Amino acid sequence: MQYLVDVHAHTIASTHAYSTIHDYISVAKEKGLKLFAVTDHGPDMADAPHFWHFVNMRVLPRLVDGIGILRGIEANIKNRDGEIDFFGDYLKELDIVLAGFHEPVFPPSDRQTHTQAMISTIESGNVDIITHPGNPAYPIDIDKVAEAAAKHNVALEINNSSFLASRKGSEGNCIAIARAVHDAGGLLVMGSDSHISFSLGGFEQAILVIREAEFPEERLLNRSPQALLSFLSERGHDSLDEYSVLLRS
């Protein structure tokens, strides 16, 4: 199956990434993707864009040459209380909100602390997707996190980049997460976590994890633009007429 949706991509606004939105649109067209999210790092990261970058995403077109563009963020989980570095009414202006642990903002601690912080983030209602929860630097109680995510309709990400250039040793955790989410009745999404446009829509290793865990296709948000957009609507984001053309994909 070809997966037409990518929820996790960084642009040159995060200065350790190397591509523009134009670059991503070009690659999306070449690869046949229909929808992707621009999710630069939240402002508490040292090289992240300013808060205003996210506020001003309203200027981004929803569609370019038939490619849908979601306005998003990969926010930073800041503490055990599940606070993130983007807040208030500004969150409502974004189409999609991802959040995860990043060492410069939340240094690795212990399993109990990581689990509490992740569950608090899930319970906050502010975050749609938890990124790279299988990172071995941040051990968690996988079953508890999967159950909380299912209860609160938050998706957990299987992050393809975790099997390539970063977060080495994630495979076992990610398989366990996929199985736990399966058992809890929750949702998964694959993210390329692209920091350069060529890797947009690259899910090769994540697909192997999904298959190993025998995760059901109908609970994988990448399966179609409609699946992701319906999920975001259920999460309280606005349904946008501009994306209606994508719902036939």
Swiss-Prot record:
Its EC number is 3.1.3.-. Binds 3 Zn(2+) ions per subunit. It is an enzyme of class 3 (hydrolase). GO terms for molecular function: phosphatase activity; zinc ion binding. CDD domains: PHP_HisPPase_Ycdx_like. Zn(2+) 2 binds at residues 16, 41, 195. Its cofactor is Zn(2+). InterPro entries: Phosphatase_YcdX_put (IPR023710), PHP_dom (IPR004013), PHP_phosphatase (IPR050243), Pol/His_phosphatase_N (IPR003141), Pol/histidinol_Pase-like (IPR016195). GO terms for cellular component: cytosol. Keywords: Hydrolase, Metal-binding, Zinc. Disulfide bonds: none annotated. Zn(2+) 1 binds at residues 8, 10, 74, 193. Signal peptide: none annotated. HAMAP family: YcdX_phosphat (MF_01561). Belongs to the PHP family. NCBIfam families: PRK09248.1. This is Probable phosphatase Swoo_1706.
